[in-house]
Amino acid sequence: MTNIRKTHPLLKIVNTSFVDLPAPSSLSSWWNFGSLLTICLAVQIATGLFLAMHYTADIETAFSSVSHICRDVNYGWLLRYLHANGASMFFICLYLHVGRGLYYGSYMFLETWNVGVALLFAVMATAFLGYVLPWGQMSFWGATVITNLLSAIPYVGTDMVQWVWGGYAVDKATLTRFFAFHFILPFIIAALVMVHFLFLHETGSNNPTGIPSDLDLIPFHPYYTIKDILGFVFMLTALLTLVFFSPDLLGDPDNYSPANPLSTPLHIKPEWYFLFAYTILRSIPNKLGGVLALVLSILILVALPMLHTSKQRSMTFRPISQFLFWLLVADLLTLTWIGGQPVEHPYMLIGQTASILYFSLILIFMPLAGIAENHLMKW
């Protein structure tokens, strides 16, 4: 008798995706982050749903409702901090996932990669909207500064800002619509994840060597299910350690003060996971130029397949490209550090230098390294 998982219409889909899926035998731990991101999304949707039951999207009561969740709701503090720190874990896994794709040439799966970039934009938008909801000082001023960037768009900019705000300033209408979008976007992200999976399963996974692995495939279960469970344990341990021992480590103290339009914080900054892009934005004195650089700092990922010049897919056997890759990682960490510093000397100069290096590495040095390595290999 044939196993039910291979004949049942629904179980058959699960079986071909997670049980009998042929996977390369050489996948390292860097391939764990896709499954970790799925867990992160599930945690965020679950905690967010329960938080939404107690939160009120009104400027008069939003701050108080978050306080009420932490003080009066059973395990409300746990829900709130799981959600807030879960977002940080989400971005850690997301950036490592993208970095893995860059290092091992996974961007050569065009459809999967482009859907992934769309997912990155959607997750960043969701996180920004969520940061506004507690209606603290940094929520209010972050929303004001970031949405105001739309005014840099020629001709229609000012109208777009007022359209997003729902008035002439960040106010009640802004908070209401931000909550509505923050609620619906994770479900759109979940749908995009399905499309991401669909395209990935059309081609099969890449592997650390970058060489087609059709001759050496193993079933996903039990090998990679066990491996993924180990990843879940490590990630959830890190998340729970953060939540129970230092829940405010990655937050901003200013957000514990209710929003006050008459008092500007000394240093307006987004959450840590946006600081690298924020530095690039600040590095250009021109407003429109800064906004374009901000968007291009993420959109540049779409261009990676076109910038691939090496005859090898992965960087595993390409030492020059490896050096440039780790230089890019160091540059991104520098950008993140500078984003948290005030706009003054020497931070501005370091930020501008790091921003130029970021684009130069991706657009100029990495493609040149690929060509050089081809010549060195006499290809």
Curated annotation (Swiss-Prot):
<dbReference type="InterPro" id="IPR016174">
    <property type="entry name" value="Di-haem_cyt_TM"/>
</dbReference>
<dbReference type="InterPro" id="IPR005798">
    <property type="entry name" value="Cyt_b/b6_C"/>
</dbReference>
<feature type="transmembrane region" description="Helical">
    <location>
        <begin position="33"/>
        <end position="53"/>
    </location>
</feature>
<keyword id="KW-0472">Membrane</keyword>
<feature type="binding site">
    <location>
        <position position="201"/>
    </location>
    <ligand>
        <name>a ubiquinone</name>
    </ligand>
</feature>
<keyword id="KW-0479">Metal-binding</keyword>
<dbReference type="GO" id="GO:0006122">
    <property type="term" value="P:mitochondrial electron transport, ubiquinol to cytochrome c"/>
</dbReference>
<dbReference type="GO" id="GO:0008121">
    <property type="term" value="F:ubiquinol-cytochrome-c reductase activity"/>
</dbReference>
<feature type="binding site" description="axial binding residue">
    <location>
        <position position="196"/>
    </location>
    <ligand>
        <name>heme b b566</name>
    </ligand>
</feature>
<feature type="binding site" description="axial binding residue">
    <location>
        <position position="83"/>
    </location>
    <ligand>
        <name>heme b b562</name>
    </ligand>
</feature>
<keyword id="KW-0496">Mitochondrion</keyword>
<keyword id="KW-0830">Ubiquinone</keyword>
<dbReference type="GO" id="GO:0005743">
    <property type="term" value="C:mitochondrial inner membrane"/>
</dbReference>
<keyword id="KW-0408">Iron</keyword>
<feature type="transmembrane region" description="Helical">
    <location>
        <begin position="77"/>
        <end position="98"/>
    </location>
</feature>
<comment type="function">
    <text>Component of the ubiquinol-cytochrome c reductase complex (complex III or cytochrome b-c1 complex) that is part of the mitochondrial respiratory chain. The b-c1 complex mediates electron transfer from ubiquinol to cytochrome c. Contributes to the generation of a proton gradient across the mitochondrial membrane that is then used for ATP synthesis.</text>
</comment>
<feature type="binding site" description="axial binding residue">
    <location>
        <position position="97"/>
    </location>
    <ligand>
        <name>heme b b566</name>
    </ligand>
</feature>
<feature type="transmembrane region" description="Helical">
    <location>
        <begin position="320"/>
        <end position="340"/>
    </location>
</feature>
<dbReference type="GO" id="GO:0045275">
    <property type="term" value="C:respiratory chain complex III"/>
</dbReference>
<keyword id="KW-1133">Transmembrane helix</keyword>
<dbReference type="Pfam" id="PF00033">
    <property type="entry name" value="Cytochrome_B"/>
</dbReference>
<dbReference type="InterPro" id="IPR005797">
    <property type="entry name" value="Cyt_b/b6_N"/>
</dbReference>
<keyword id="KW-0249">Electron transport</keyword>
<feature type="transmembrane region" description="Helical">
    <location>
        <begin position="113"/>
        <end position="133"/>
    </location>
</feature>
<keyword id="KW-0812">Transmembrane</keyword>
<keyword id="KW-0679">Respiratory chain</keyword>
<keyword id="KW-0813">Transport</keyword>
<dbReference type="InterPro" id="IPR030689">
    <property type="entry name" value="Cytochrome_b"/>
</dbReference>
<dbReference type="InterPro" id="IPR027387">
    <property type="entry name" value="Cytb/b6-like_sf"/>
</dbReference>
<feature type="binding site" description="axial binding residue">
    <location>
        <position position="182"/>
    </location>
    <ligand>
        <name>heme b b562</name>
    </ligand>
</feature>
<comment type="similarity">
    <text>Belongs to the cytochrome b family.</text>
</comment>
<feature type="transmembrane region" description="Helical">
    <location>
        <begin position="347"/>
        <end position="367"/>
    </location>
</feature>
<dbReference type="InterPro" id="IPR036150">
    <property type="entry name" value="Cyt_b/b6_C_sf"/>
</dbReference>
<dbReference type="GO" id="GO:0046872">
    <property type="term" value="F:metal ion binding"/>
</dbReference>
<feature type="transmembrane region" description="Helical">
    <location>
        <begin position="288"/>
        <end position="308"/>
    </location>
</feature>
<keyword id="KW-0349">Heme</keyword>
<feature type="transmembrane region" description="Helical">
    <location>
        <begin position="178"/>
        <end position="198"/>
    </location>
</feature>
<keyword id="KW-0999">Mitochondrion inner membrane</keyword>
<dbReference type="InterPro" id="IPR048259">
    <property type="entry name" value="Cytochrome_b_N_euk/bac"/>
</dbReference>
<comment type="subunit">
    <text>The cytochrome bc1 complex contains 11 subunits: 3 respiratory subunits (MT-CYB, CYC1 and UQCRFS1), 2 core proteins (UQCRC1 and UQCRC2) and 6 low-molecular weight proteins (UQCRH/QCR6, UQCRB/QCR7, UQCRQ/QCR8, UQCR10/QCR9, UQCR11/QCR10 and a cleavage product of UQCRFS1). This cytochrome bc1 complex then forms a dimer.</text>
</comment>
<feature type="transmembrane region" description="Helical">
    <location>
        <begin position="226"/>
        <end position="246"/>
    </location>
</feature>
<dbReference type="InterPro" id="IPR048260">
    <property type="entry name" value="Cytochrome_b_C_euk/bac"/>
</dbReference>
